[in-house]
């Protein structure tokens, strides 16, 4: 874990100590089979009883001459800071929120609105619209905006928890996939709940780059813990 990731998580240590019963943390490794890239994430979140919640996510990637090797010369990929408010009407949870992503030479501002409908004890569905404004600090590339839509469906059975997710993005200025301004992703997640622990695996389908129509498989494995 690099110094920036450690510093980001350190900022929330008082929260973990004083509100340990309501904190969720997870760590995750990611591998892309075509680009041979490795990424790692550390995440921590908390929601208060009044509905206000916030989270910090720190992402690093393998660098140096062997980016295809996990945990090799880790470099900072970016950080995300989220604040949100959640309230319920019946079986639907509504969540307006705002995400700030910071990286090397850019910042992205992401207001969003999410709704999650609990159908019964096993099934739930959700959707989120997010507007993204990409602000660049250099003159090489202009700022850009992206409209993004996420949809989810989840099913719980005994200790298993399955989630399928679909993502659609449309940019204003720059290409995202196959020479066009549209892009999409699919993701399937399986988690197994063991008391407060939740190990999980994910398999996704994502684009390789913005110029070709090639797709690649994204593998993720991680573990979460709820205090």
Curated annotation (Swiss-Prot):
Keywords: Signal. GO terms for biological process: oligosaccharide transport. GO terms for molecular function: porin activity. Disulfide bonds: none annotated. One of its GO terms (cellular component) is cell outer membrane. Pfam families: KdgM. The keyword Signal applies. It comes from the Bacteria. Residues 1-22 form the signal peptide. This is Uncharacterized protein YiiY. It comes from Salmonella typhimurium (strain LT2 / SGSC1412 / ATCC 700720).
């Amino acid at each position: 874990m690099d110094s920036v990731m450690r510093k980001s998580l350190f900022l929330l240590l008082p929260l973990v100590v004083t509100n340990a019963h309501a904190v969720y943390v997870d760590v995750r490794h990611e591998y892309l089979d075509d680009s041979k890239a490795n990424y790692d994430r550390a995440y921590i979140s908390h929601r208060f009883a009044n509905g206000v919640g916030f989270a910090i996510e720190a992402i690093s990637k393998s660098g140096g001459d062997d980016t295809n090797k996990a945990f090799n010369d880790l470099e900072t990929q970016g950080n995300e800071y989220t604040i949100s408010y959640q309230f319920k009407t019946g079986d639907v949870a509504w969540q307006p929120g705002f995400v700030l992503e910071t990286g090397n030479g850019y910042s992205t501002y992401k207001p969003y609105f999410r709704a999650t409908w609990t159908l019964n004890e096993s099934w739930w569905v959700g959707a989120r619209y997010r507007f993204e404004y990409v602000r660049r600090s250099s003159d090489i590339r202009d700022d850009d905006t992206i409209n993004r839509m996420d949809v989810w469906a989840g099913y719980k059975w005994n200790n298993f928890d399955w989630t399928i997710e679909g993502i659609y993005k449309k940019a204003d200025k720059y290409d995202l996939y196959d020479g066009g301004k549209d892009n999409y992703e699919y993701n399937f997640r399986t988690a197994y709940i063991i008391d407060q622990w939740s190990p999980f695996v994910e398999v996704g389908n994502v684009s390789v780059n913005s110029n070709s129509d090639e797709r690649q498989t994204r593998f993720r494995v991680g573990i979460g813990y709820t205090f």
